[in-house]
Amino acid sequence: MVASKWLARVCAVVLCLGFVSLTEAQSQPSEDRPANVPTPPQPKDPRTRAKAHTELGALYFQDGNLIVALEELTLAAAIDPEYAPAFSIRGLVLYHVKEFPSAEKDFQHALDLDERSPETNNNYGWFLCQTDRAAESIQYFARAYENPVYQTPANAYLNAGACHLKIGEIDQAEDALRKSLRLMPDNPQALYHLADVHYRRGNFDAARKQLIEVIGRVEPGPEMLWLLLRTERRLGNRGDEQSLATQLRRRFPDSAEYQELLRENYE
């Protein structure tokens, strides 16, 4: 089944690892919907109705309204239990509300319905990597980026690179990240992970240069600040190290990276 453009756009937004986080679910009642989101049309055939609710659920997901996203996607799945995208995207939402067994079930069902779907393979690979099953995830990213109908293979290469890093496969990570950058030049997420490759190889000057270039274009999160702090420490730049430590403390006091700093666990 050829993936539609809207699903490719959703995957482009939400599936890049370790860098961009979704807004937490809103606490408002489920009927409190943004005024600018249209009410889905109600055509007669189930597939069109399921697609409309899936698209709407994906929009709420992008907006961080996970409660309403789940409602729309569950409705889509009930209307057409054979519409794979509804289950694939619902799996992502279920991951973000920490319903991991239910997310796994949805991804498996989506793959049973359409095992070649590049979006579902990429989504499931991402889920596996995020739940400490990175070694299993690589094959699903490969199924995604090798599929000629996939509109955003750069995302699957990026995710594969990040997951190779998680399991210490540095050469494979670099290869995947460079392939992602060839398709999506100057992508900050790919550049961040490539800086991590440089760091792990001991190329601290290259890592520092790349990180500073990325920070000049995007607002850094705790992961990037932490990697740059460790790089400056390796280079003996104590003033820059202390400045970055202050930024972590002020901006991200609850982050895992700041907790590592407090424990002086630099590696």
What are the roles of these predicted feature ranges?
Residues 62, 96-97, 130-131, 166, ...:
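Register position in tetratricopeptide repeats
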Residues 45-79, 96:
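Alpha-helical segment of the N-proximal tetratricopeptide repeat
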Residues 50, 84-85, 118-119, 152-154, ...:
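Helix-start (N-cap) detector for alpha-helical repeat units in TPR-like alpha-solenoids
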Residues 45, 79, 113-114, 147-149, ...:
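Structural marker of alpha-solenoid helical repeat scaffolds
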Residues 28-46, 218-267:
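Terminal, low-structured helical/coil segments at or just beyond the last alpha-helical repeat
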